[in-house]
Design a protein with these regions (language model features):
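Phosphate-coordinating catalytic segments in nucleotide- and nucleic-acid-processing enzymes
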Residues: 2-13, 53-246, 313-347
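Pre-Walker A-like glycine/lysine-rich segment at the N-terminus of P-loop NTPase domains
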Residues: 1-51
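C-terminal lobe/lid and adjacent interdomain/linker elements of RecA-like ASCE P-loop ATPase modules
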Residues: 268-347
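Phosphate-binding P-loop
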Residues: 23-29, 241-243, 273-275
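Walker B motif beta-strand of ABC-family P-loop ATPases
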Residues: 248-250
Length: 347
């Protein structure tokens, strides 16, 4: 079913934002894939959108009286973990970093110079905050590092685990809710449980995570596979009500620790959530399997899955609808080179 883009990111503008090229991104879809070689800015791109989105969600929430400038400044510093904000500006230039994003038919705009210390400069704030919780799932799993991340941020107040990790563990602390969930969420949770043959849960008394298989045998989280832990994170967020149909999910290197079969099933669930609930998703990858699976899913609906290809020294990224087929990219090029090398070695 088609959903309005009113609850989604519809436009973003980057200028002098670290290693990213200066560009405008208009063709934003329900599912957005970011590909590129190492050092092209995939994670920077995801973190920039996530920081702005979370700032909009924290703005005017409850009794919080902080200004948008204060929220953004803190979010950017702890997400990118820079000593001063000016370090985020593209190196070797004197012009300011500028960012703009349109979400919920409202804009957030900010800029700051290379000399900026702790505060962003000019800020355009939305009229109201967002009634949603978005989440960033990093490449590293967090369940076995749960207490370490919390201590690092809440006790030591030190850099090491950025806000993507800290926000995630705080969201995972929320206990699952009883009662009816969104149908698409409930279906996805069942599918997730089938993929990992059990579920991961939190023991309030011991303060530790554990894995329970389909035969109800319990295993310490340290003895549980990385793939199970990664998939279980989404299951927990669907179960505890942290995510809703206005949430935006950012996943960095979705293929990390997952077998290709699990990747395909995981992406099927992501597609179901995006299609039935209208949840928007941004995914980065180095995996051929992820790209190919999303191309196959994109054949179901035009303008539903967009691919952004970042390339070193390119003036702007290449953006295309995956409904039109596999994009040109270094992952495919490398696969072809290996195949050609195999042929040559066999001669």
């Amino acid at each position: 079913m088609d959903r309005s883009m009113s609850n989604k990111i519809r436009f973003c503008h980057f200028e002098n934002f670290g290693i990213l090229p200066t560009f405008d991104f208009y063709n934003i879809s329900s599912i957005n894939l970011i590909i590129g070689e190492n050092g092209t800015g995939k994670t920077v791109f995801l973190k920039a959108l996530y920081s702005a989105t979370r700032a909009m969600e924290e703005y005017k929430r409850g009794d919080d009286i902080r200004s948008m400038a204060d929220i953004l400044s803190e979010k950017l510093r702890w997400t990118f973990q820079v000593e001063k904000l000016g370090d985020m500006v593209t190196r070797g230039i004197s012009e300011s970093l500028s960012f703009q994003m349109s979400l919920d038919e409202q804009n957030v705009v900010y800029q700051f110079s290379p000399s900026a210390e702790r505060k962003v400069g000019a800020v355009t704030a939305p009229d109201v905050g967002r009634n949603a919780n978005s989440i960033f799932i990093p490449a590293k799993e967090v369940l076995s590092l749960f207490s370490i991340i919390l201590e690092s941020r809440e006790v030591d107040k030190s850099f090491g685990f950025d806000d993507t990790y800290y926000d995630l563990v705080k969201a995972l602390r929320i206990a699952p809710k009883r009662g009816r969930n969104f149908d698409a969420f409930a279906k996805s949770r069942k599918n997730l449980k089938d993929v990992i043959n059990g579920k991961v849960d939190f023991d309030e008394r011991s303060g530790k995570w554990y894995y329970k298989d389909k035969n109800n045998y319990r295993f310490a989280i340290g003895a549980t596979s990385e793939g199970i832990k990664k998939i279980s994170i989404l299951d927990r967020l669907l179960a505890n009500g942290y995510l809703n149909d206005q949430s935006i999910i950012f996943i960095d290197e979705i293929e990390s620790a997952l077998h290709p079969e699990a990747i395909c099933k995981f992406l099927d669930m992501i597609y179901e959530i995006a299609d039935k609930m209208g949840v928007q998703v941004f995914i980065s990858t180095h995996s051929y399997f992820v790209i190919k699976k999303l191309v196959l899913l994109a054949m179901r609906k035009k303008e539903f899955i967009t691919c952004i290809s970042l390339k070193k020294d390119a003036k702007k990224p290449y953006i295309n609808d995956l409904h039109d087929g596999m994009p040109d990219n270094s992952i495919i090029d490398t696969s072809i080179q290996l195949y050609e090398q195999e042929i040559e070695e066999g001669l």
